[in-house]
Amino acid sequence: MAVQQNKPTRSKRGMRRSHDALTAPLLSVDKTSGETHLRHHVTADGYYRGRKVINK
């Protein structure tokens, strides 16, 4: 089993954790329906960038 030889410093620990922060999802409002959706995704009613792309 691997065992560390030296204790990692607070600085090294912080540098390792610098990429662990969570980000909120980016939301957009559709031009035609005004519906909120994830960026670069189709809305629930089938619109993407103001165009109907999925027929239900």
Swiss-Prot record:
MF annotations from Gene Ontology: structural constituent of ribosome
Region: Disordered, residue numbers: 1-37
A biological-process GO annotation: translation
Record-annotated disulphide pairs: none
Protein name: Large ribosomal subunit protein bL32
Family assignment from sequence similarity: Belongs to the bacterial ribosomal protein bL32 family.
GO cellular component: large ribosomal subunit
Keyword Ribosomal protein: yes
InterPro entries with a match to the protein in the record: Ribosomal_bL32, Ribosomal_bL32_bact, Ribosomal_zn-bd
UniProt KW keywords: Ribonucleoprotein, Ribosomal protein
